[in-house]
Amino acid sequence: MSTLKKISDEDRESKFGYVFAVSGPVVTAERMSGSAMYELVRVGYYELVGEIIRLEGDMATIQVYEETSGVTVGDPVLRTGKPLSVELGPGIMGSIFDGIQRPLKDINELTSSIYIPKGVNIPCLSRTQSWGFNPLNVKVGSHITGGDLYGLVHENTLVKHKLLVPPRAKGTVRYIAPPGNYTVDDIILETEFDGEINKWSMLQVWPVRQPRPVTEKLPANHPLLTGQRVLDSLFPCVQGGTTAIPGAFGCGKTVISQALSKYSNSDVIIYVGCGERGNEMSEVLRDFPELSVEIDGVTESIMKRTALVANTSNMPVAAREASIYTGITLSEYFRDMGYNVSMMADSTSRWAEALREISGRLAEMPADSGYPAYLGARLASFYERAGRVKCLGNPEREGSVSIVGAVSPPGGDFSDPVTSATLGIVQVFWGLDKKLAQRKHFPSINWLISYSKYMRALDDFYDKNFQEFVPLRTKVKEILQEEEDLSEIVQLVGKASLAETDKITLEVAKLLKDDFLQQNSYSAYDRFCPFYKTVGMLRNMIGFYDMARHAVETTAQSENKITWNVIRDSMGNILYQLSSMKFKDPVKDGEAKIKADFDQLYEDLQQAFRNLED
């Protein structure tokens, strides 16, 4: 949304339409013939930003991205001739935008008010800040096409901002700027094609509703490691995957999406707060600058790899719809540089409610629960922009966009239209459970209803790096499922009447639930669990289960048979060690020490069972 024309600048009256009717955020204007769908307009004397969403004859229906009080019939409407676009260039990382990419910090400094004034017209990326530009191996006379890398800007210590030729440009280089400091408006590249000369600065403008082109889509094969044990082990997502986190209020959706943005193995994070409470965004803004990530032994603030699109519930409804598109376009831009990007959308239900409100104002036919009939198609067109791709241009590189969408169905009802439409599209479903959250079991992921369709795609990765992992995961799922089946019997007849092997299943399931699936995201040792620690914990717990069952089954016929009570009484120390594996701190103890401790515990296990059977 670069600086648009003002009404006072326009000298031709034919460029004006006039307001015909106002209904909340929807304005109808007449004498608008010649305008295009999704064209940006400025409405009224306050010059509010709006977008044309319907054309009939010379009447245009406009959704306005700001408060429309004070707009009257007969006010001028200025056409700008551009679609809703975002500015792409150095300066995105670490900034906070609203739904149509207005920089909130700059607006605050300009107006020294906590509110955004009407019709504020300020560039999205700073025009005065200069960036150190280094050309790559592009010289005068080189031939370049869309997507080629021609320069580097060290935007900050975490992100190298690679400058790309815009996707539709091509030609022979006539001029490339020498290394030095430039602002985003300075011309740093000139190309010539068919006698036509084009000048390019660091800044690109791209329409948000249009996906950025790629060479081809690739199958995903690398996991998106979240640092949450239950997700990494049982329901993994891939880099370039789509995930939904539905859950009622207070189940911890926001905490999971924040944990993803803090600890996942992504290069760039785009966090879109779309219609959620303002306090949640301010919590992100308070926490993120203090958090750090260690890259190559250097500690850096996480804010350096994050951009926030804040469109909270007290901002105008229409901009909520745009904020999701703004976020995904920013993500695609960083993907084109060859980065792995994660985009968090919190929450897509509020976005769907914005669609519902605007659809209602347009008097369209409502479908299920009053949502528009095209809800599924809109959701799909958003989630389809995720994926791992081969980027346009040279040098060859791969990037990915992973989308994690939080869904807040009213009352935690998963048959809600938004949830069911989302589940038909996404490949990973992390279902949050109100009952688990009330028991203070966090992350409150219900391991019986959640699923991931990427298991098969990740088998190669596990075979190469963690060979023992896949059978362990299968065993965990079996134990948890068996425990669910046994729990009904236990409620009827009590634990004492169960078979010995079933008692072991129940106890190991309890161990898994309390000390493996549960994770305290506010503690130093457990807020992030690396994958080697996850696998090590699983190996010891399942090793204990297998050995205990083996001991019980082999001595079932003999005179001194081993029962669960015998095992529990003689192995109190080992059970305590199993449940305290999570207290190993990956930062303080380091990978080698934790692995050695886990291997030692496994040997102690084997020794203890040998002693027991003798």
Swiss-Prot record:
Pfam families: ATP-synt_ab, ATP-synt_ab_N, ATP-synt_ab_Xtn, ATP-synt_VA_C. The keyword ATP-binding applies. ATP binds at G247, A248, F249, G250, C251, G252, K253, T254. V-ATPase is a heteromultimeric enzyme made up of two complexes: the ATP-hydrolytic V1 complex and the proton translocation V0 complex. The V1 complex consists of three catalytic AB heterodimers that form a heterohexamer, three peripheral stalks each consisting of EG heterodimers, one central rotor including subunits D and F, and the regulatory subunits C and H. The proton translocation complex V0 consists of the proton transport subunit a, a ring of proteolipid subunits c9c'', rotary subunit d, subunits e and f, and the accessory subunits VhaAC45 and ATP6AP2. GO terms for molecular function: ATP binding; ATP hydrolysis activity; proton-transporting ATPase activity, rotational mechanism. NCBIfam families: PRK04192.1, V-ATPase_V1_A. The gene is VhaA. This is V-type proton ATPase catalytic subunit A. InterPro entries: ATP-synt_VA_C, ATP-synth_a_Xtn, ATP_synth_asu-like_sf, ATPase_a/bsu_AS, ATPase_F1/V1/A1_a/bsu_N, ATPase_F1/V1/A1_a/bsu_N_sf, ATPase_F1/V1/A1_a/bsu_nucl-bd, ATPase_F1/V1_b/a_C. GO terms for cellular component: lysosomal membrane; proton-transporting V-type ATPase, V1 domain. Its EC number is 7.1.2.2. It comes from Aedes aegypti. The lineage of its organism: Eukaryota, Metazoa, Ecdysozoa, Arthropoda, Hexapoda. It is an enzyme of class 7 (translocase). HAMAP family: ATP_synth_A_arch. ATP hydrolysis occurs at the interface between the nucleotide-binding domains of subunits A and B. ATP hydrolysis triggers a conformational change in the subunits D and F, which induces a shift of subunit d. The c-ring is subsequently rotated and results in a continuous proton translocation across the membrane.
